[in-house]
């Protein structure tokens, strides 16, 4: 009891104010007080004799537990000084008590883990002997003793044979994986219906003079067994692009010429070939896939040459007539055209994008094509509408909205110098390639090296905007407030895509500012799928689609929209 009294006396003498004022008004003083209390507790423990004094409870707890609780409290106080719920719309994780998984969920997770282990163990087992001698004869296997001691006593001389079998097995596995991963082995499944004029055949002489970035700049130099192959365009057989092909080093981690050749031939057969030539094109694709699966470089090059001969033999008027009747195309065709321009203009200069300052408004990140197709579809983006991207980076979102949905205008604004330069070069490359593929690219406009704040062109277009994209994942408070002012003039029906909610947590209507657009937003939250953004492959994040309404949204009046519900039973949380 003496230790307890000494402890209380030290705290009281350190600061004459009540303890509740210490906690609220002076966290630094609180830290000093706790340190003083710890020191006093240590002195009292040293003064005691025997084991009885050292185990004396302090304030109903052991001294170690009290110090631990004080450190946790200090951590919370320091954390609270960094966050302001009103301005940053978030709380630190240490303020949120996480629910424990229920017993049912825990049991299911354990069962799933056991099943996974069993599956892995079963995958390592050989085929059972009940398959019969015929199966063993076909596979070239001989019966082996099942005794583990016999396996352990196998002579070391068989190591070479085993290694040889392992190498052969790994070679077969690699070929199987390549065959399964063939970009041109199976027909495209995700098909979209064209709601606008997608194809436009331009003057032949104009396309002959088109300048595209060569793929040779993306492939390594002086590689053994490397062959240069020409691939002719289906609409303009006089125009071709060169590729370096080698199965020894098919992929340098950035660009795979073999994949791109196969995809170009696949799309030409699926989309551009008239019905009378479809059968020949399908056989050619099978030949190409077989050469790819067997890693036969000469057979692959021969198949490409046969494709070039077939392209020259197809009458161009039949191709043009077939395109006029085409109403569906694979969505992957659009994504791959975008990738062709991106890989030649952005990837070689991607290091310039790393100059962005971390944890600032100028951190660079990309939304990937598959996610953009999904979110544009959720926003019901249509031909003839206006799409705007504020903070457009290298322009990926802008060009995809134009190419995939045929917007009347796709507009992007970017302030950073390097990203602006890449956006300009990527747009030029895309225009050249779309012309060679006969694709009608709708109007695209950029406001480069300029902020979207106090931007005359942005202010002019926003009232007409139908779909607005703002990647506000790392915007600070000041920029979020500027965005709130900027979007006040959006028309009813406009969709706003964001990675952070425009309306802060616990937002309720301010009757002194009833006309604020935040009162008229209908906010929908969605889970971010895997491979949606460039900065992480994991999913599980959130994105929001807010629809501007003509009237005030009812949710801003509801009690659950408040940050703290009063007069209601508090929610129960597990410890």
From Swiss-Prot:
The keyword Repeat applies. Keywords: Chromatin regulator, Methyltransferase, Nucleus, Repeat, S-adenosyl-L-methionine, Transcription, Transcription regulation, Transferase. It is found in: Nucleus. S-adenosyl-L-methionine binds at residues 364-367, 387-396, 414, 451-452. InterPro entries: Dot1, DOT1_dom, H3-K79_meTrfase, SAM-dependent_MTases_sf. GO terms for biological process: DNA damage checkpoint signaling; DNA repair; global genome nucleotide-excision repair; meiotic recombination checkpoint signaling; methylation; mitotic G1 DNA damage checkpoint signaling; mitotic intra-S DNA damage checkpoint signaling; negative regulation of heterochromatin formation. It comes from the Eukaryota. Belongs to the class I-like SAM-binding methyltransferase superfamily. DOT1 family. This is Histone-lysine N-methyltransferase, H3 lysine-79 specific.
């Amino acid at each position: 009891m003496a230790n307890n009294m000494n402890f209380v006396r030290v705290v009281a003498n350190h600061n004459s104010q009540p303890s509740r004022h210490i906690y609220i008004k002076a966290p630094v003083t609180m830290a000093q007080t706790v340190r003083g209390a710890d020191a006093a507790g240590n002195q009292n423990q040293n003064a005691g004799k025997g084991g009885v004094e050292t185990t004396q409870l302090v304030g109903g707890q052991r001294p170690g537990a009290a110090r631990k609780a004080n450190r946790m409290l200090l951590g919370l106080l320091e954390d609270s000084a960094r966050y302001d719920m009103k301005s940053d719309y978030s709380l630190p994780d240490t303020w949120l008590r996480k629910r424990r998984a229920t017993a049912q969920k825990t049991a299911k997770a354990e069962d799933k883990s056991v099943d996974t282990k069993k599956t892995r163990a079963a995958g390592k087992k050989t085929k059972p002997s009940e398959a019969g001698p015929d199966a063993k004869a076909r596979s070239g296997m001989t019966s082996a003793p099942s005794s583990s001691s016999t396996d352990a006593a196998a002579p070391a001389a068989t190591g070479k044979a085993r290694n040889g079998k392992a190498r052969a097995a790994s070679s077969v596995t690699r070929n199987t994986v390549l065959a399964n991963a063939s970009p041109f082995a199976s027909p495209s499944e995700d098909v979209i219906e064209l709601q606008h004029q997608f194809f436009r055949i331009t003057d032949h002489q104009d396309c002959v003079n088109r300048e595209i970035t060569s793929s040779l700049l993306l492939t390594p130099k002086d590689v053994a067994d490397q062959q240069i192959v020409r691939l002719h365009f289906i609409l303009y057989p006089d125009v071709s692009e060169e590729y370096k092909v080698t199965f020894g080093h098919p992929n340098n981690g950035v660009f795979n010429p073999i994949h791109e050749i196969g995809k170009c031939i696949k799309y030409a057969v699926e989309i551009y070939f008239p019905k009378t030539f479809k059968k020949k094109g399908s056989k050619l694709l099978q030949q190409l896939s077989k050469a790819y699966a067997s890693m036969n470089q000469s057979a692959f090059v021969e198949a490409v040459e046969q494709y070039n001969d077939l392209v020259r033999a197809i009458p161009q008027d039949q191709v043009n007539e077939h395109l006029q009747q085409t109403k569906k195309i694979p969505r992957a065709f659009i994504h791959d055209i975008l990738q062709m321009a991106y890989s030649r203009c952005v990837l070689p200069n991607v290091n310039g994008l790393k100059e962005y300052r971390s944890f600032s408004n100028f951190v660079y990140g990309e939304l990937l094509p598959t996610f953009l197709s999904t979110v544009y579809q959720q926003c019901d983006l249509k031909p003839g509408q206006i799409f705007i991207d504020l903070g457009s980076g290298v322009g990926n979102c802008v060009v995809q909205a134009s190419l995939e949905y045929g917007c009347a205008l796709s507009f992007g604004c970017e302030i950073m110098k390097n990203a602006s330069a890449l956006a300009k070069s990527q747009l030029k490359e895309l225009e050249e390639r779309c012309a060679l593929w006969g694709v009608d690219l709708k109007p695209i406009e950029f406001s480069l090296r300029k902020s979207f704040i106090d931007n005359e062109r942005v202010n002019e277009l926003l009232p007409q905007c139908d779909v607005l994209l703002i990647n506000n994942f790392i915007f600070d408070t000041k920029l979020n407030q500027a965005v709130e002012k900027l979007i006040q003039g959006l028309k009813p029906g406009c969709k706003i895509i964001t990675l952070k909610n425009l309306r802060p947590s616990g937002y309720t209507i301010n009757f002194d500012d009833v006309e604020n657009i935040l009162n008229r937003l209908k906010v929908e939250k969605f889970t971010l799928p895997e491979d949606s953004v460039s900065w992480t492959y994991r999913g599980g994040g959130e994105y929001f689609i807010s629809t501007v309404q003509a009237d005030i949204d009812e949710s801003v009046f509801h009690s659950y929209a408040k940050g703290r519900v009063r007069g209601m039973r508090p929610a129960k949380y597990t410890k």
